[in-house]
């Protein structure tokens, strides 16, 4: 690709140049439920309730209640599109991200004069200040607790060490200057920073950058152990682009933000302050989450007190639907990279590729392509699966297949499971292991082996052919031909 992607705008320009990757509408859309309802049909995919499909990204150019605002959705809701945006073959994205972690380029802080995100500044002390009017954040369903920022790059630092981190969190706009922030239990990344600051009685400065280079959005989804506490994931995005991500000093807090973001929210996580997530809707629901279900509202969530909202001239809001293919891309590609890295270090050359399948939202299920080259490799495929669970503790199921199976083709994977697996010997269960709280089946009500919500029975499906049986499982081999000789306009399906 000749177009260089450095921010959201250049990403959109690239997609505009590729047929079928972007659509627009200037028909007025209500950001409350209607916008997400439209995109569900256009291109959400993932674990969204059917009917849905993987389709183009979409820009809404006439947003009710927000004159002049634009909202873009689905930028990453296609693996092929992510390949365009990161300049990689879709099937090689996991390898590219693995290499980026190893060759990290730390972010740099630039002068405020270069901060495009601060072309317009709104202070919380300004008359009429209201984040709900300044930011066209959608409400995905009629049951949602409120409007959510779903693609905010949350950036904060350890109050003692100064180490910084960036992550994406569930952010609900609660009032004119307050946002609730959901943390997955376990105090990873910013959660650990918040707990330390609160224990010391200090508010935690935090910036939320919205509308950034897609490389940043995907890099921010890495988790321990691949990126341990204090590892700044912006350095992964730097490696992808071959140059450091530029940060700028915030206007009202002692923290940095992404300099070319479309919007930045500046604020502080308050000490001891908590808010009921659905205080404004009273639905008992939060928002649609990546497993495909609407998450329950939390009774008590930490509160961000907003100090300012800054943005570029004519800013573009970016959002996503929680269960969409967009989440699969953001969470799944780092999952693949993490598994590839851990297994390759333990048994070089055996794992050929990994796919974090859409049905698990990019987190719950992975298909591993394993190549057995010598008799002693028999059984090592299951060791690879165990390593995958260590690489991503939230992973619930692993499907193992041979190198002749296309892991990105669900029919091919199911074919392998149907013709190469016997359930009594090829399914390995590991009960009582911590997994993810947003999977509703990870609950004592669903199994006697589960003692606490968030615990699961992890499962390995070994659909690989035993090494000494390979001769009996050869796939039919067809003649290689040039189809275009017979059908000049024919295109091989990718």
Language-model region placement:
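Extended, highly charged
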Residues: 1-303, 307-494
């Amino acid at each position: 690709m000749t177009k260089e992607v450095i921010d959201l705008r250049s990403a959109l320009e690239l997609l505009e140049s590729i047929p079928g990757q972007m659509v627009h509408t200037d028909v007025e859309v209500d950001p409350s439920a209607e916008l997400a309802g439209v995109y569900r049909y256009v291109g959400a995919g993932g674990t969204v309730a059917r009917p849905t499909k993987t389709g183009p990204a979409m820009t809404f150019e006439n947003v009710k209640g927000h004159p002049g605002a634009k909202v873009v959705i689905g930028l990453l809701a296609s693996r092929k599109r992510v390949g365009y945006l990161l300049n990689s073959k879709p099937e090689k994205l996991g390898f590219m991200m693995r290499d980026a972690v190893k060759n990290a380029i730390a972010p740099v802080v630039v002068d405020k004069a270069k901060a495009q995100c601060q072309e317009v500044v709104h202070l919380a002390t300004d008359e009429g200040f209201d984040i709900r009017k300044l930011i066209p954040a959608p409400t995905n369903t009629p049951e949602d607790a409120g409007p959510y920022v779903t693609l905010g790059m949350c950036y904060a630092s350890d109050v003692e060490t100064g180490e910084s981190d960036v992550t994406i969190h569930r952010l609900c706009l609660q009032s004119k200057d307050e946002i609730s922030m959901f943390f997955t239990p376990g105090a990873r990344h910013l959660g650990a920073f918040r707990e330390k600051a609160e224990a010391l009685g200090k508010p935690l400065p935090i910036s939320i950058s919205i509308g950034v280079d897609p490389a940043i959005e995907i890099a921010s989804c890495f988790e321990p152990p691949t990126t341990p506490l204090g590892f700044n994931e912006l350095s992964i995005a730097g490696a992808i682009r071959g140059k450091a991500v530029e940060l700028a000093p915030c206007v009202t807090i002692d923290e940095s933000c992404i300099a070319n973001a479309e919007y930045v929210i500046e604020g502080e996580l308050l000490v001891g302050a908590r808010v009921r997530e659905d205080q404004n809707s009273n639905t008992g629901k939060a928002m649609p989450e990546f497993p495909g279900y609407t998450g329950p509202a939390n009774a008590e969530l930490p509160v961000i007190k907003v100090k300012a909202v800054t943005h570029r001239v004519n800013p573009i809001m970016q959002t996503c639907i929680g269960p969409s293919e967009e989440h699969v891309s953001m969470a799944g590609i780092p999952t693949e990279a993490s598994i590839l890295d851990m297994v390759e270090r333990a048994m070089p050359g055996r794992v050929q590729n990994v796919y974090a399948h859409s049905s698990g939202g990019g987190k719950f299920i992975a298909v591993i392509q394993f190549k057995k080259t010598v008799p002693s490799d028999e059984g090592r495929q299951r060791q690879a699966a165990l390593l995958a669970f260590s690489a991503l503790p939230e992973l619930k199921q692993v499907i193992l297949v041979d190198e002749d199976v296309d892991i990105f083709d669900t029919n091919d994977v199911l074919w392998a499971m149907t013709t190469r697996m016997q359930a009594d010997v090829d399914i390995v269960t590991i009960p009582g292991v911590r997994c993810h709280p947003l999977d509703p089946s990870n609950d004592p009500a669903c199994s006697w082996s589960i003692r606490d919500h968030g615990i699961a029975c992890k499962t390995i499906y070994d659909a690989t052919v035993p090494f000494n049986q390979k001769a009996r499982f050869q796939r039919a081999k067809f003649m290689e031909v040039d189809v275009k000789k017979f059908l000049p306009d024919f295109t091989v399906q990718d």
